[in-house]
Amino acid sequence: MRLFLSLPVLVVVLLMILEGPGPAQGAPESVEASSGLDKLKEFGNNLEDKVREFFKRIKESDIPAKTRNWFSETLQKVKEKLRIES
């Protein structure tokens, strides 16, 4: 229930932040918007780099191979037990 209520609130807050300052605040909108977009673009680029590095580490690690081997060994053990019992 909390998630159901918090998602609309989060969307409204995000829209208010992205909307920028109102005209009464007197900040030049073009400079403010471009700096906000630059920050957002920089954040996106940083996030992309981190995600790529994360997946690269997973591909290079031996965790997938170990997991695959464990499943294969477990499946073989189950097959052997079924052959013995039948």
From Swiss-Prot:
Signal peptide start and end residues: 1-26
Location in the cell: Secreted
Disulfide bonds, paired cysteine numbers: none
First-listed, main subcellular location of the protein, grouped into a coarse class: secreted
Pfam family name, one: ApoC-I
The keyword Secreted is assigned to this record: yes
InterPro entries to which the protein is assigned, alphabetical: ApoC-1_sf (IPR043081), ApoC-I (IPR006781)
Keywords per UniProt: Lipid transport, Secreted, Signal, Transport, VLDL
Protein function: Inhibitor of lipoprotein binding to the low density lipoprotein (LDL) receptor, LDL receptor-related protein, and very low density lipoprotein (VLDL) receptor. Associates with high density lipoproteins (HDL) and the triacylglycerol-rich lipoproteins in the plasma and makes up about 10% of the protein of the VLDL and 2% of that of HDL. Appears to interfere directly with fatty acid uptake and is also the major plasma inhibitor of cholesteryl ester transfer protein (CETP). Binds free fatty acids and reduces their intracellular esterification.
Anything else known: Apolipoprotein C-I is present in acidic (APOC1A) and basic (APOC1B) forms in P.paniscus, P.abelii and P.troglodytes and perhaps also in baboons and macaques. The two genes for ApoC-I arose through a duplication process that occurred after the divergence of New World monkeys from the human lineage. In human, the acidic form has become a pseudogene sometime between the divergence of bonobos and chimpanzees from the human lineage and the appearance of the Denisovans. Pseudogenization resulted when the codon for the penultimate amino acid in the signal sequence was changed to a stop codon.
UniProt-recorded name of the protein: Apolipoprotein C-I
Organism listed in the record: Saimiri boliviensis boliviensis
